[in-house]
A protein has these predicted regions:
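Right-handed parallel beta-helix/beta-solenoid
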Residues: 1-28, 45-47, 70
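Detector for repetitive beta-architecture
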Residues: 3, 38-40, 46, 64, ...
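Right-handed parallel beta-helix/beta-spiral solenoid domain characteristic of secreted/periplasmic
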Residues: 24, 42, 49-51, 58-108, ...
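Short glycine/acidic-rich loop motifs that flank beta-strands on beta-rich extracellular proteins
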Residues: 51-54, 79-84, 103-109, 127-134, ...
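Acidic, glycine- and Ser/Thr-rich low-complexity intrinsically disordered tracts
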Residues: 321-381
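Extracellular ectodomain surface segments
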Residues: 381-434
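Acidic, turn/loop-rich segments in luminal/extracellular domains of secretory-pathway
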Residues: 431-493
Length: 497
């Protein structure tokens, strides 16, 4: 097991590359080696490599080949006219702690690969062609991408095709641009887990959506924050699909836009859509499809979701389907269902036990408190800090700050919560002020915030815009911590100038 060091500034390809003082200079030199299981290739922080990195050899499950970084400073950067990192047929590979930007193709491309992990990789400005996903895997097995960031790319954020075993965990995608770009596009794949991601298509120059799943099998999409786009989650022709506990908003590009949609491109069966907060968009859950197609839509269960600020109904069913819409919470002013008469008369899609409330935010805060209390009671041996997603909705503005508290729906085992980080900055004893896309916000350690809208920054069109701020909390002594996001939704139709 050998560690090879590569430094674009001080290295030389005449060196042996086996210690930091005798590092190689180029990735092509590494490619000339026959890497063995357990070997590592570490790129010096601060280095810039203007070449594609081809991974040709495989590790083993117990001794993967690792591509990472060393030293201090900013992450090493790979630029390339082709892909950033490219591999065919290699197995048992770990890629971590790098940045890939300004590449002509994909940031990372893997074809017919097995057991890959991509961790803490920053990918930006990829794809001179819109056909290239920033992270692309095809015909592969067991691929995990976690804690990575994709931003301002031309093409899909993730393009996954015919992969058995996919995990996308705790990633961020912002602005996947292009005429066919989604934050995540996944076709003909199975055993899928998409969890804990923040995917934002609010400012993307794309008519598409956030997550597009085509013919998924055994898929779970949970605990994500999905914002913007023509749709939130399009899950077509799937088998055994769970979509739960997501925050989905800002999907209002078209009259047909939806938070969750299914029924197109083939038969769909066994969907569980539950625990989601669906708001600030057009349709909620849309069970639909093309006219004349004979697709079946079987056992579609929509339950325990919360719907508010929708211009269309929380549930739309206009094609033959069987299932149920039960125990959902719908804010007054939002239409509950739009079910075609033929389907209603067939009694194949039942509606029961749903609730209408005056204020969804109050209901959500109460539910979060109950869940936190129950979690603490049942798991005293495993204390933790839990942060919950926060929303600020601005319908009118008179120049005064819009106020709230980030911590009131969070919880900790010792009943102490402190706001430590907001955006990319630490929160000091005098608080912190940041300037956002549409206004400025001041926060303090107690979680209080004051958002002041700057109407001069708003676009000229009507409708909605939004921006998000990440934040981190702990229990006062940093033994336990968690993080989440505040999303500010601005309804421009009602603003007072």
């Amino acid at each position: 097991m050998t560690i090879y060091y590569v430094n674009s500034t001080t290295g030389s390809d005449g060196n042996n590359g086996t210690n930091q003082t005798s590092a190689f200079a180029t990735l092509s030199k590494v490619e000339s080696l026959k890497l063995k299981p357990g070997d590592s290739v570490l790129l010096a922080k601060g280095s810039v490599f203007n070449e594609q990195f081809d991974i040709k050899y495989s590790g083993t499950e117990s001794a993967p080949i690792k591509i990472g970084s060393y030293g201090t400073g900013s992450a090493p950067v790979i630029h390339s006219n082709g892909d950033g990192i490219h591999s065919l047929y290699a197995s048992n590979i770990v890629i971590e702690n790098l940045k890939i930007s300004n590449v002509g193709g994909a940031g990372i491309y893997g074809g017919s690969v097995t057991n890959w992990t991509v961790r803490n990789v920053d990918i930006a400005k990829t794809g001179l062609s819109e056909s290239a996903g920033a992270v692309t895997f095809r015909s592969s097995t067991n691929v995990t991408v976690e804690s990575s960031k994709v931003s301002d790319v031309k093409g899909d954020g993730f393009w996954i095709e015919k992969v058995a075993g996919v995990k996308l965990l705790n990633n961020t995608v912002t602005s996947a641009n292009g005429s066919t770009a989604d934050a995540v596009q996944m076709n003909d794949s199975s055993n899928i887990l998409i969890k804990g991601n923040h995917l934002d298509q609010t400012d993307a120059s794309s008519p598409k959506g956030v997550i597009a799943l085509v013919r998924p099998t055994n898929a779970v999409v949970e605990d994500n924050v999905l914002t913007g786009g023509g749709f939130g989650i399009s899950a077509q022709a799937g088998k055994t699909v769970a979509i739960r506990d997501n925050d989905i908003s800002g999907f209002h590009g078209y009259s047909w836009s939806f938070a969750v949609g299914l029924g197109d491109q083939g038969n769909a069966r066994d969907y569980d859509i539950s625990g989601n907060h669906i708001h600030d968009g057009a349709w909620g859950v849309a069970v639909s499809g093309p006219i004349g197609a004979s697709y079946t839509r079987t056992n579609i269960k929509v339950h325990d979701n919360t719907f508010d600020d929708l211009t269309q109904a929380a549930l739309k069913v206009d094609r033959p389907a069987s299932g149920s819409f039960t125990n959902n919470t719908i804010e007054s002013g939002t239409t509950a269902t739009s079910i075609s008469p033929a389907i209603a008369d067939a009694h194949t899609f039942t509606v029961s036990g749903n609730h209408t409330v005056a204020n969804v935010e109050t209901t959500l805060a109460s539910a979060d408190t109950k869940v936190a209390s129950a979690t603490t009671t049942e798991a005293d041996a495993d204390p933790a800090v839990v942060a919950a997603h926060d929303n600020l909705k601005i319908f009118t503005d008179n120049g005064a700050a819009h106020r709230g508290n980030l911590l009131e729906n969070d919880s900790s085992d010792n009943d102490t919560l402190v706001l430590r980080r907001f955006g990319d900055e630490s929160v000091g004893k005098h608080g912190l002020t940041l300037t956002g896309d549409y206004g400025s916000i001041h926060v303090d350690r107690e979680g209080n915030y004051a958002y002041t809208l700057d109407e001069t920054k708003l676009p000229s069109h009507d409708g909605h815009v939004s921006e998000s701020f990440s934040y981190g909390i702990d229990d006062g002594n940093a033994h336990h911590s968690d993080a989440d996001t505040l999303t500010v939704y601005i309804h421009m139709d009602g603003l007072v100038s």
